[in-house]
From Swiss-Prot:
HAMAP family tied to this protein: Malonate_deCO2ase_dsu
Protein name (record): Malonate decarboxylase acyl carrier protein
Keywords: Cytoplasm, Phosphoprotein
Post-translational modification: Covalently binds the prosthetic group of malonate decarboxylase.
Recorded GO MF terms: acyl carrier activity
Coiled coil: none
Length: 99
């Protein structure tokens, strides 16, 4: 198991909390809750050791060049593909936009 942390610039805190996915379905669970203004924080707990560069590239592509709400994101991963990660994050942001 490996724990990775990432931080990106963000706007105002998001509204509400959400949980999307589950580790046994798609191998990924994403929890989101409001964060501190100006900061999007991500913690990934993954069963895939040595995958930090892959996660960093995925987040760079997703979070750069666009303004996101300030949230804290906890990701529990059991070998999900980048496509599943992106899908779950997009679902999470969609959910908090409706709270």
């Amino acid at each position: 198991m490996e724990t990775l942390t990432f931080q990106f610039p963000a706007a105002e805190p998001g509204r509400g909390r959400t949980l999307v996915g589950c580790v046994s379905s798609g191998d990924l669970e994403v929890l989101m809750e409001p964060g501190t203004a100006g900061s999007l924080n991500i913690q990934v707990v993954t069963s895939v050791n040595g995958s930090g560069a892959r996660w960093e590239q995925l987040f760079q592509r997703l979070f750069q060049g666009r303004t996101w709400p300030a949230v804290n994101i906890d990701i529990h991963d059991f070998g999900a593909t980048p496509g599943v990660v992106r899908l779950r994050l997009e679902q999470g942001f969609e959910e908090i936009a409706h709270d």
